[in-house]
C-alpha cells in the first residue's frame, strides 16, 4: 500500500473485485500511515473492502487453516506504534481488523507496548517480524541458519509470547526468504508472509 510501490486505489479495488470473483483472499501490506502510505489512501482501501462485503482476515486465521476467501488481509509492518494508533478510529469506523507485524519489539517502551496491547480490543493482532529487520538469506550466508533462528527469529516470537500474544505467523523482512529458512521457521509458527513485487520495484527499509 506504500506509495513507493506505485499502485493506485483503483488497482487495489480491482484486486478486491478479483478476490470476490475467485473467492480468494487478497493480501495488502504497508508501513507508516501518514508517511509511507497516505491515510486517505488507506481509508479508501479499507472502505472499498467494506463496500464489497469482504471480511478482514488475520494471519492467525491462515495459521488455523481459515480465511481462504473471499476476503482481504491487511497488514502494517515494523514498529510505528504512534502512527498505527492514530488510525485506530478510522479502522473502527469500518470494523477493519489488521495484523501488525512488529520488528524490534524488545526495544519498545512500556508505553508503546501498552498501546499495542490496546489494539487487541479492536480485533487486531500482533505477529513477529524479527528482532533487527535484516535480510535473512544474507544473514544465513554470513552466520548460519542456527544463528538466524537464535538471534533474530525465535527471540521475536518468544518476546511476543511472553507478553501474551500467540505469535502464530511470521513476516520476512523485505520478503527475503529461502525454502531452508521457511522449513525451520514453520516448526515454530503456522504461516509465513513473504512478498512479491512488480519487476524493478525497489525494496527499501521503511524502518526507522
Stretch-by-stretch model annotation:
Residues 1, 24-35, 69-72, 82, ...:
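Metal-dependent polysaccharide deacetylase catalytic core of the NodB/CE4 family, i.e.
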Residues 1-74, 116:
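N-terminal pre-catalytic segment of deacetylase/amide-hydrolase enzymes
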Residues 14-18, 48, 90, 155, ...:
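A generic secondary-structure signal
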Residues 15, 41-45, 86-90, 114-115, ...:
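A short acidic, amphipathic alpha-helical/loop segment
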Amino acid at each position: 500500500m506504500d506509495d513507493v510501490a506505485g499502485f493506485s486505489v483503483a488497482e487495489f479495488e480491482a484486486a478486491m473485485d478479483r478476490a470476490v470473483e475467485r473467492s480468494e483472499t487478497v493480501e495488502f501490506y504497508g508501513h507508516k500511515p501518514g508517511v509511507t502510505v497516505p491515510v486517505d489512501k488507506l481509508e479508501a482501501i479499507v472502505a472499498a473492502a467494506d463496500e464489497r462485503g469482504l471480511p478482514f482476515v488475520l494471519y492467525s486465521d491462515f495459521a488455523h487453516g481459515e480465511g481462504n476467501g473471499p476476503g482481504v488481509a491487511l497488514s502494517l509492518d515494523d514498529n510505528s506504534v504512534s502512527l498505527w494508533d492514530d488510525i485506530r478510529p478510522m479502522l473502527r469506523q469500518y470494523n477493519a481488523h489488521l495484523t501488525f507485524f512488529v520488528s524490534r519489539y524488545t526495544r519498545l517502551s512500556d508505553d508503546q507496548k501498552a498501546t499495542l496491547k490496546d489494539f487487541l480490543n479492536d480485533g487486531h493482532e500482533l505477529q513477529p517480524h524479527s528482532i533487527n529487520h535484516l535480510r535473512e538469506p544474507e544473514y544465513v550466508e554470513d552466520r548460519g541458519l542456527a544463528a538466524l533462528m537464535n538471534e533474530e527469529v525465535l527471540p521475536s516470537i518468544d518476546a511476543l509470547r511472553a507478553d501474551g500474544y500467540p505469535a502464530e505467523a511470521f513476516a520476512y523482512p523485505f520478503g527475503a526468504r529461502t525454502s531452508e529458512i521457511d522449513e525451520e521457521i514453520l516448526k515454530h509458527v503456522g504461516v509465513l508472509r513473504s512478498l512479491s513485487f512488480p519487476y524493478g520495484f525497489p525494496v527499501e527499509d521503511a524502518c526507522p
